Amino acid sequence: MHDIGYSIDEDSHNKYSQKLILKEGLSDFSEKETEIISCICRYHRGDLPDKKEDKLYKDFDKDEKRTVKRLGGILRIADGLEDDEIGEIKDIKIDYNEEDYITEISIYTKEEITPDIKTIIRKKNLFEYGFRTQVVLKFRKLK
């Protein structure tokens, strides 16, 4: 659902995904849930949520904003992992260090890869913002 905006514009598909969801609605969800889902799709790439620029996000309460940041952050990382350069992912392990607020995400692939570091850094920022943690992504070849 987060990529439905591709049908209108590839570069801004995240913004168009949000607009389409808001315009058409989601039959199994309330209006508020639909707004939250639209924002999750909006922020799966690009800028971080901005209370000043995004009127819809600005009007959410604290819990709704946290939901957008957290689920959007998870979606953003997952979206980055579907990159052709990474290939088929065989396993993912997530460890959280409460003492240091570090989340280590180990991604296991069949082949050894060297992902684009700039892309990885961009993809983890919303997760870090939403969960108040530092993310360390590790790519490992499955043994």
Predicted features along the sequence, with ranges:
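Divalent metal-dependent catalytic cores for phosphoryl transfer on phosphate-bearing substrates
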Residues: 1-94
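Hydrophobic alpha-helical segments
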Residues: 81-84, 127-130, 134
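Hydrophobic beta-strand residues in large extracellular and virion-surface proteins
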Residues: 94, 105-107, 135-137
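Short flexible coil/turn linkers enriched for glycine and charged/polar residues
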Residues: 98-103, 129-131
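A short interface-forming secondary-structure element
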Residues: 104-118
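C-terminal accessory subdomains of helicases
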Residues: 109-112, 123, 139
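Extended Gly/Ser/Thr-rich low-complexity repeat segments
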Residues: 115-130
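A short amphipathic beta-strand at an alpha->beta junction
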Residues: 131-143
